[in-house]
Amino acid sequence: MNPMILTVAVAAAFLLGSVRPAQALVLHPDGEPNLAVWTDRPPKNVVGRWGGNASCVAVSPNCVLTTRHQGGGIGTLVEIDGVKYPVTQVWVCYTADLRLARLYGANLPDFVGLYEQTDEPGRQIVIGGYGVGAGAPLQANSRTYGYEWDDYASRSLRMGTNRIEDAAAQNELQEFTTDIVIADFDTLGPGGSTTYESIPAAYDSGGGWFIKTADEWKLAGLTRAVESHFEAGHANDPNYILYQSWFRKPDNPILPDPDTLDAVRISSYAQWINNTLPGVLPGDLNGNDHVDAVDFSIFALYWQRTDCRPPDWCLGADSEPDGDLDALDLAYFARHWLDTDPAP
């Protein structure tokens, strides 16, 4: 079994003194999955890049969830599947390190539902985020105990696995108070590690922790923080931070010493998210807040298709939804012809 490192968003301050905002995923050199052949995971396009320093997760055709500590807001560009969408509205969740953002021009085919159960501890997860990967191995007595974080220019989507170990309520980090779920970055081999064991690192804040239930992937957490390490004699001094992830003790690498990682606990905020999610303008198939000829051309592409499936139902053209595009869907589309959503 192979550990991977998930990084957090780059921030000036470090969370909880001994943890820091997450930035990216790091894996063991021989343990990174091939996303082209690894299918037991969420769709890659449910994870996006938030601005230039974090990640986010699509939870509707035009909205993403992310953390707050990395900054950004209205006007931030979110990149999903190679397309950049500007943020036009933001809703923040009370004191939590959590926000919902609406994307202009988005009608995303891939998005995930929320994991609303409170039985997360013990469940295996897939973690996804954009950020740096594993760099040089850290060794003592010819044993690897961790990894440097790779060059900060090396940012791409990475996915790995882990297992939620615990949960905590009202955890304070910077100016936020947030319910969290907690995992750790285990060593390779038998024990607590998972197949593609991973931990966040730079630019992974806001990336997803996903649980599979009834063959459906749901969002259980948003990467928030990882354990920090400092140069000797400079504990908790951000000027002497070590951009590393450990899974064994550096002074005795025979012994395990896994770094901790945590995420915003989605089940605690599911009601707020569901109540806040804005609706999608019926018939607006390209997400520009107008129902016009461009939307009709998209509708025509799917006309008489019989393979519309959740979550997107042929980009929303199958309005019933019942799996096919027929006269009833056309009548529904016509009823909303030239409708417009007012600017937020």
Describe the role of every protein-language-model region.
Residues M1-L6:
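Positively charged n-region of N-terminal signal peptides that target proteins for export
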Residues L25-G48, A54-Q70, M159, T194, ...:
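C-terminal subregion of chymotrypsin/trypsin-like serine protease catalytic domains
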Residues S18-A24:
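Sec/Tat signal peptide C-region and signal peptidase I cleavage site
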Residues S60-P61, L65-A96, A106-L108, D119-V126, ...:
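Catalytic-histidine neighborhood of serine endopeptidases
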Residues T7-G17:
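Bacterial N-terminal signal peptides
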